[in-house]
A protein has these predicted regions:
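Short, structured coil/loop segments at alpha-helix boundaries
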Residues: 63-65, 99-100, 104
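Conserved binding/recognition cores within well-folded domains
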Residues: 2-92
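Short, surface-exposed, low-complexity cationic segments
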Residues: 108-110
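C-terminal structural segments of small proteins and small subunits
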Residues: 87-91, 95-98, 105
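Charged phosphate-binding loop/patch that engages nucleotide di/tri-phosphates or the phosphate backbone
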Residues: 115-117
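Short, solvent-exposed loop/turn segments at secondary-structure junctions
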Residues: 75, 104-105
Length: 117
């Protein structure tokens, strides 16, 4: 897995099955972990591959920046958050993601500058 390219044209590459994929990081809405599988949801489709949400968090913060982890199972691209309350994020596709109590302060601090949570 890697993130490649300039900031405006970054691509996240990964392998699912025996196929190598490359997606524009701007289209990534969120990563969701289920056991050792990662569901990568973009504006156009969903991909599944093996990995951990912790690995995704490190990779996206180092290589791309800006992704936030509101819950132990999710890593979210803030560009796709339409609104945020103390307990949940609503994404541009209507998906609601719970903000865990242990991560609430970090999320609030992060979003207070962007969208006034």
């Amino acid at each position: 897995m890697a993130v490649e390219g300039s900031r405006d044209e970054r691509r996240f590459t990964f392998v699912s099955g025996r196929v190598r994929y490359s997606v524009d990081t701007r289209s990534i809405m969120y990563f969701e972990s289920e056991l050792r599988r990662i569901n990568l949801v973009t504006t156009e489709q969903k991909y599944v591959f093996y990995g951990s949400i912790g690995e995704m968090e490190k990779r996206m913060k180092v290589d791309y920046g800006g992704f936030i982890r509101p819950h132990e199972s999710y890593l979210v691209n803030p560009d796709h958050v339409s609104r945020c309350t103390a307990h949940e994020m609503i994404l541009t596709n209507g998906k609601s993601i719970h903000i865990s109590a242990t991560r609430r302060a970090d999320v609030k601090r992060y979003y207070s500058e962007l969208i006034n949570c």
